[in-house]
Amino acid sequence: MAEKKTLSKQRARSILHAASKKIVLVTGDAMLDQFIWGEVDRISPEAPVPIVNFKRESFMAGGAANVARNLTSLHCSAQMHSVIGRDEAGKKLRILLKDDHVDCQSLINSNSRQTSCKTRIIAQRQQIVRVDREAGLDLESQLSKRLTKSIETGLSKSKAIVIGDYGKGIITQDFLNKIKQLGKLHDAWLSFDPKPVHSLDLSELSLITPNRKEAFELAGICDSTKNPKPLKDKNLIRVTKQLIDKLGLKILLVTLGELGMLICQPGKKAFHIPTLAREVFDVSGAGDTVIGTFTMAIAAGADPIEAAILANHAAGVVVGKLGTATVTPKELLDSFN
């Protein structure tokens, strides 16, 4: 089927229907997101910082786990393949994922790891500060082998994997190489959310989804100019071509914040998709929504342009919500009105 430059609501509905019968495997750093909500009405006499009056707290699955819950929110089945600690944060994360209908049979608890937890303090609809609790140790060889085996088993039912690298130690080069080998063996689609400071060989992947800053870092090029029209941004286009050629990617999807996203394919002109967000309250986890929705759409038979447009619509919905949010099929289809 020839690639389209637009996506109708009817076609989006058809993709979502097909996706409801698919399974996507998710691996990488599964984290717990804690939100403390409060109000600020004065500055502390102890230091020039706001005093937040506590109102409530909430917890959500974060990192690669947020990709999984974004998939199930869209009625696509998701398997979580990761390692978390045998601690309270790990227990809470597992419960949250099960509540979100994520398959957690391959979510391994380990005494040697701490579950990564990000605590965000929010007042007046703005994030005041974030506190990170994490070990960041590389995954032990034995646990890596267990994860690899579980992914291999999962590929008997799925042909798509999302790999979320948040620099917390799950994604090592050895583990990534094994996933690539399995991808080749099973002809599976491999989507990767990169962390440039975590230097890895990203060749032979189907898709990577860096933001602008990450794309320039991956290419080793200084981002000295920025054109409000991405297709006329010579430096950006140069970076995308270099990454496509260097890594042998099928798709490069660069997220550009308020400028939308740029989808690039070998031998084709880059295609710009403007943002659809009307109001932006919180970008936490928006990248997870993009990579999850795109991969789900590809698994459901969408072409890359259709998948990118659908992912852009999904991102436009979640950034209008506070917290690590997801989008439902109804919300996604309503965004086409």
PLM features per residue range, with description:
Residues 169, 173-270:
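Conserved phosphate/ATP/ADP-binding segment of small-molecule kinases
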Residues 157-170:
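Short acidic, glycine-rich surface-loop motifs adjacent to enzyme active sites
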Residues 30, 166, 289:
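Active-site metal-binding loops of divalent metal-dependent hydrolases
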Residues 107-113, 120-155:
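Conserved phosphate-binding/catalytic loop of the ribokinase/pfkB sugar-kinase fold
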Residues 1-41, 336:
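Positively charged, low-complexity intrinsically disordered leader regions
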Residues 242, 246, 250, 276-335:
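Conserved post-catalytic alpha-helical subdomain immediately downstream of the catalytic base
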Residues 5-15, 45, 49-116, 332-335:
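Substrate-binding N-lobe of the ribokinase-like
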Residues 25-27, 130, 159-162, 191, ...:
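Structural motif
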